[in-house]
């Protein structure tokens, strides 16, 4: 348990250091490139030009975390208990329920015109969000599941203790997700908690970070903002079918895709 807390503290130290360094460099860049008396349109254009810079900083943070946790074997990418011959089947079936639920969630939010996106996500295009998807998927899986939950499992902690610990550790990220009015984004927090519960359960069964990387990345490919009601209805129907079918397939197929415990 102590190791899991130490991993979290180490991750926070590296993550915050990257943020402070990135914030300093971005602030310096804008200070040097914004002339005095600039119009708001010029400032907005300059803010858009720093997105690639922020993405580079994000990937730099990934490299730092990967080197630290990989070099000292705190975490690693592996298939875990998944049989290698069944890896593609496992990736598909494990992804179906959370992908379907995400489709249902986004379709309901858009069909009922509910404001659930933080301002930062509203300003980013679908393709522009992909790098952040990669960064977020890596951090979530490599640190919170591959290092922290893995250590909790090795310590013999019960599943509810694992989930409670992960929820507390991820809480600061949920607090940072605010609506345009400045309130805590309850909708995305609920989606994040449900995703956390599902991914924690999948990891406890498979012990596979590779499966979870695919799961996180694919579920984040669902378009989160659209105006077409037809698309919303189609996503709602397809998402419901994927969720129900995915859980049914998991209950039947998951045990046969895992290595049998020796005991």
What are these regions (language model features)?
Residues 16-35, 67-71, 102-111, 174, ...:
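Short hydrophobic alpha-helical membrane-anchoring segments
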Residues 4, 8, 126-262:
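Transmembrane helix-loop-helix hairpins at the membrane interface
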Residues 30-50, 71-143, 149-150, 154-155:
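Juxtamembrane helix-loop-helix connectors linking adjacent transmembrane helices
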Residues 3-21, 57-60, 92-102, 163-168:
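Alpha-helical transmembrane segments
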Residues 1-9, 71-87, 254-263:
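N-terminal juxtamembrane cytosolic/stromal segments of multi-pass membrane proteins
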Residues 9-71, 127-128, 233-241:
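Alpha-helical transmembrane segments in multi-pass membrane proteins
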């Amino acid at each position: 348990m102590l190791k899991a807390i130490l991993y979290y503290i180490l991750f926070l130290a590296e993550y915050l250091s990257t943020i402070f360094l990135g914030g300093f460099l971005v602030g310096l860049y804008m200070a040097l490139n914004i002339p005095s008396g600039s119009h708001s349109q010029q400032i907005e254009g300059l803010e858009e030009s720093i997105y690639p810079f922020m993405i580079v900083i994000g990937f730099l943070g990934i490299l730092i975390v990967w080197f630290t946790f990989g070099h000292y074997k705190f975490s690693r990418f592996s298939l875990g208990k998944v049989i290698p011959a069944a890896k593609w089947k496992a990736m598909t079936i494990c992804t179906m329920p959370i992908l379907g639920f995400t489709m249902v969630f986004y379709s309901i939010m858009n069909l009922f015109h509910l404001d659930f996106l933080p301002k930062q996500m509203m300003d980013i295009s679908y393709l522009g969000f992909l790098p952040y998807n990669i960064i977020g998927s890596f951090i979530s899986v490599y640190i919170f599941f591959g290092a922290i939950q893995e250590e909790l499992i090795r310590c013999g902690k019960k599943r509810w203790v694992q989930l409670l610990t992960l929820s507390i550790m991820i809480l600061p990220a949920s607090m940072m997700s605010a609506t345009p009015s400045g309130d805590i984004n309850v909708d995305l927090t609920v989606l994040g908690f449900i995703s956390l519960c599902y991914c924690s359960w999948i990891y406890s069964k498979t012990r596979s970070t590779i499966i979870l990387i695919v799961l996180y990345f694919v579920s984040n490919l669902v378009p989160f903002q659209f105006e077409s009601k037809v698309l919303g209805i189609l996503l709602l129907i397809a998402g419901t079918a994927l969720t129900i079918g995915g859980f049914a397939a998991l209950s039947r197929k998951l045990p046969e895709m895992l290595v049998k415990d020796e005991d």
